[in-house]
From Swiss-Prot:
Gene encoding the protein: Nr1h3
Example GO BP: negative regulation of pancreatic juice secretion
Post-translational modification: Ubiquitinated. Ubiquitination by UBR5 leads to its degradation: UBR5 specifically recognizes and binds ligand-bound NR1H3 when it is not associated with coactivators (NCOAs). In presence of NCOAs, the UBR5-degron is not accessible, preventing its ubiquitination and degradation.
Name assigned to this protein: Oxysterols receptor LXR-alpha
Annotated function: Nuclear receptor that exhibits a ligand-dependent transcriptional activation activity. Interaction with retinoic acid receptor (RXR) shifts RXR from its role as a silent DNA-binding partner to an active ligand-binding subunit in mediating retinoid responses through target genes defined by LXRES. LXRES are DR4-type response elements characterized by direct repeats of two similar hexanuclotide half-sites spaced by four nucleotides. Plays an important role in the regulation of cholesterol homeostasis, regulating cholesterol uptake through MYLIP-dependent ubiquitination of LDLR, VLDLR and LRP8.
Organism: Mus musculus
Pfam families assigned to the protein according to its UniProt record, in alphabetical order: Hormone_recep, zf-C4
Cross-referenced InterPro entries: Liver_X_rcpt, NHR-like_dom_sf, Nucl_hrmn_rcpt_lig-bd, Nuclear_hormone_rcpt_NR1, Nuclear_hrmn_rcpt, Znf_hrmn_rcpt, Znf_NHR/GATA
Quaternary structure annotation from Swiss-Prot or TrEMBL: Heterodimer of NR1H3 and RXR (retinoic acid receptor). Interacts with CCAR2 (via N-terminus) in a ligand-independent manner. Interacts with SIRT1 and this interaction is inhibited by CCAR2.
Length: 445
C-alpha cells in the first residue's frame, strides 16, 4: 500500500496521537468523500544533507527504532533456536511453578495453575504494565499473586512462560479456519473420483467490487501526497566516521521521522476505510494505536527485494540487515522483519489483496480498550468476505491461498510483541522518542 499525507510537513510536532483526529474543512474539489483529512502536525527537520528523491514505487517507512547509540555492528544475525517437544506427563500432585498452587498442566511452556495461565494470557494480550509498590521483590505464593501483579508477571517469565505461545481469540479462529481449509483440500485430493456437486465459489458483489476499487484508488491518491514529507526526513548519514555521535544521532532521527510519517499515513488511510469514521473516536484511536506497527510491517514486506535481501523505503536507497543493526535495532527484531518480508514476498500479493489485509488488521475487535467490539467484528467480517471472494477468483487453483494470507496476520501479532520489547529496550536506554511515537507505543517517561 502506499499510505499518504495531504499537506507538507509543518513546523510543529503533535503532542499526542489524538491530534491526528482533528479535522479541517473539506476541499470542495475532492471527489466522493475520499478526502484525506489529517491534522498534520509532526515536526520534520529540513534536511541539511543530500535530499533523497522519491518515486511512485517508493517504500513505506516502518517503525524501526534504534536501541542504543553505541550498539556495535553484529557479525552474526542468527536467532536462537528453541527446543520443541511434547510436554511431560503429569502425576497429579505437581505444583504451579509461579505461585505454588496445584498445577493443571503445562501452559505456555511452564507447569502452572489455571489462575497463572489466565493471568499471563490476559497480561500479554492487553500489553499490561504493572507497578510493584514494594521494590519488585515480593515473594510469590497463592496470597501474594493477588496483591502484586508486577512480581507475578515477572515470576511467570522467570519460570519460562513464553509470550509467543499466547494466542488471541482472533488467532485461534484463524488457526481453526486454516485447519478446516487444509482438511477440505486433503479430502478433495484423496478421493478425486468421488462424484460431488461442483463447489460454488464466492463471487464479488457490486458493493464489494466498488469497495476494493475505492481502497486501491485511495492508496494511489495518498501515495502521491506523501512524497514531500519523506523528502524532509533527516537523510541517512554519509560520514567518514559512521560510529561518531553525530552519525548515530542522525540515524536515530532518520528512522523515528520515517516512523512518524508512517503513522500519519496509516491514520490518513484508515479514515477512508468504509465504516471506520462511523466508530466512536475512542475506538478509532484504540484500533490504530495497536494496529499501527502491524500495518507498518505489512508495508515493509511490500518493499522487500529477495535478490539483494534488502528493503527499499526511499527511492534509490535500500536497507539490509546490517544497516538496521547500525541504526540500533536488536537482532531479535531485525531477523523476524526480514523473514516475514520474505514469506510475504513469496505470496506475490497485489495492491487489492494488500489493502484488504490491512483493513482486516485494523478492524480487530480484540484490541485493548475497544468498546464496541461487536460493530468492529461486523466491519472486519465485511473485509474478510471480500478478500475471500477476491482470492477465490484470482487464485482458483490454490484453495490454501486465503488461509495462508490470514495466517500472516497471526505472524504479525508475534512480530508486534517483539516490537514491544524493542520499544521497551529504548525506554531502558533512556532514548527519547518524539511525543507522537511515545503515545502510540505507550512509552511513558
Amino acid at each position: 500500500m502506499s499510505l499518504w499525507l495531504e499537506a507538507s510537513m509543518p513546523d510543529v510536532s503533535p503532542d499526542s496521537a489524538t491530534e491526528l483526529w482533528k479535522t479541517e474543512p473539506q476541499d470542495a474539489g475532492d471527489q466522493g468523500g475520499n478526502t484525506c483529512i489529517l491534522r498534520e502536525e509532526a515536526r520534520m527537520p529540513q534536511s541539511t544533507g543530500v535530499a533523497l528523491g522519491i518515486g511512485l514505487e517508493s517504500a513505506e517507512p516502518t517503525a524501526l527504532l534504534p536501541r542504543a547509540e553505541t550498539l556495535p555492528e553484529p557479525t552474526e544475525l542468527r536467532p536462537q533456536k528453541r527446543k520443541k517437544g511434547p510436554a511431560p506427563k503429569m502425576l497429579g500432585n505437581e505444583l504451579c511453578s509461579v505461585c505454588g498452587d496445584k498445577a493443571s498442566g503445562f501452559h505456555y511452556n511452564v507447569l502452572s495453575c489455571e489462575g497463572c495461565k489466565g493471568f499471563f494470557r490476559r497480561s500479554v494480550i492487553k500489553g499490561a504494565r504493572y507497578v510493584c509498590h514494594s521494590g519488585g521483590h515480593c515473594p510469590m505464593d497463592t496470597y501474594m499473586r493477588r496483591k502484586c501483579q508486577e512480581c507475578r508477571l515477572r515470576k511467570c517469565r522467570q519460570a519460562g512462560m513464553r509470550e509467543e505461545c499466547v494466542l488471541s481469540e482472533e488467532q485461534i479462529r484463524l488457526k481453526k479456519l486454516k485447519r478446516q481449509e487444509e482438511e477440505q483440500a486433503q479430502a478433495t485430493s484423496v478421493s478425486p473420483r468421488v462424484s460431488s456437486p461442483p463447489q460454488v465459489l464466492p463471487q464479488l458483489s457490486p458493493e464489494q467490487l466498488g469497495m476494493i476499487e475505492k481502497l486501491v484508488a485511495a492508496q494511489q491518491q495518498c501515495n502521491r501526497r506523501s512524497f514531500s514529507d519523506r523528502l524532509r526526513v533527516t537523510p541517512w548519514p554519509i560520514a567518514p566516521d559512521p560510529q561518531s555521535r553525530e552519525a548515530r544521532q542522525q540515524r536515530f532521527a532518520h528512522f523515528t521521522e520515517l516512523a512518524i510519517v508512517s503513522v500519519q499515513e496509516i491514520v490518513d488511510f484508515a479514515k477512508q476505510l468504509p465504516g471506520f469514521l462511523q466508530l466512536s473516536r475512542e475506538d478509532q484511536i484504540a484500533l490504530l494505536k495497536t494496529s499501527a506497527i502491524e500495518v507498518m510491517l505489512l508495508e515493509t514486506s511490500r518493499r522487500y527485494n529477495p535478490g539483494s535481501e534488502s528493503i527499499t523505503f526511499l527511492k534509490d536507497f535500500s536497507y539490509n540487515r546490517e544497516d538496521f543493526a547500525k541504526a540500533g535495532l536488536q537482532v531479535e527484531f531485525i531477523n523476524p522483519i526480514f523473514e516475514f518480508s520474505r514469506a510475504m514476498n513469496e505470496l506475490q500479493l497485489n495492491d487489492a489483496e494488500f489493502a484488504l489485509l490491512i483493513a482486516i488488521s485494523i478492524f480487530s475487535a480484540d484490541r485493548p480498550n475497544v468498546q464496541d467490539q461487536l460493530q468492529v467484528e461486523r466491519l472486519q467480517h465485511t473485509y474478510v468476505e471480500a478478500l475471500h471472494a477476491y482470492v477465490s477468483i484470482n487464485h482458483p487453483h490454490d484453495p490454501l491461498m486465503f488461509p495462508r494470507m490470514l495466517m500472516k496476520l497471526v505472524s504479525l501479532r508475534t512480530l508486534s510483541s517483539v516490537h514491544s520489547e524493542q520499544v521497551f529496550a529504548l525506554r531502558l536506554q533512556d532514548k527519547k522518542l518524539p511525543p507522537l511515537l511515545s503515545e502510540i507505543w505507550d512509552v511513558h517517561e
